[in-house]
């Protein structure tokens, strides 16, 4: 009798109850009629290595990795993609048939695809891009923008030293500007990106003067709770096109689903609704 192996994937984090990934992948499994499972896994830090090596034996094809384990996932992998190595973090792990663990980072891909989908005609090559923040999310965004051909990225962070460290990692197309003077560097920018937590539910607002920003410039926020952050509301009020952060979450999930379940999923309004469902 032939044994049929049902594919399993999941998401690892601590805490994990906030993750929207199960909603996305279970929606796709239903839509494409795939018999498979996607489960949230609450893991303690000291158990991460053991869990990574146990999951393939339990039938797992791979996992997404969320906070606080994205950096450690790199260390536990046998092979690391170039972009994950540059970013220094992985969010997509694939357990290969030969027993090796492959680590990738699809956050930057999700960011770029979200902008291309949400702002038709947007191009990273058009003009300077202003990025706010220098944390882990900013690394993924910078990597993707430079790979996509951005001519200049102006980076501002409340702690300037962190921005300078990113500039050292990413090279001459990244310039560091003062956090308090960033508004004055926007007059020729065509994209403004917020990668900080400012404006997120429960966090202080991002207080930023957009008067110098061209009204043609696309404004995007990687935060998706709330969908319309104060920054996006301010941009809409002055006529700028805006792209919310939810699409980044949706698009970054697609490559992993394809690797684990064999189907390239579509990003649809129904998927957005599933992601927002409580």
Curated annotation (Swiss-Prot):
Positions of NADP(+) binding: 82, 133-137, 157-162, 222, 245
Residues at the catalytic site: 70 (proton acceptor)
Keywords on record: Amino-acid biosynthesis, Aromatic amino acid biosynthesis, NADP, Oxidoreductase
GO molecular function: NADP binding; shikimate 3-dehydrogenase (NADP+) activity
Catalytically driven reaction(s): shikimate + NADP(+) = 3-dehydroshikimate + NADPH + H(+)
EC number: 1.1.1.25
Pathway(s) this gene product operates in, as recorded in its UniProt entry: Metabolic intermediate biosynthesis; chorismate biosynthesis; chorismate from D-erythrose 4-phosphate and phosphoenolpyruvate: step 4/7
Enzyme's top EC category: oxidoreductase
GO cellular component: a single term: cytosol
GO biological process assignments: amino acid biosynthetic process; aromatic amino acid family biosynthetic process; chorismate biosynthetic process; shikimate metabolic process
Subunit organization: Homodimer.
Family, similarity comment: Belongs to the shikimate dehydrogenase family.
Record-linked PANTHER family: BIFUNCTIONAL 3-DEHYDROQUINATE DEHYDRATASE_SHIKIMATE DEHYDROGENASE, CHLOROPLASTIC, SHIKIMATE DEHYDROGENASE
Name of the molecule in the record: Shikimate dehydrogenase (NADP(+))
Gene (name only): aroE
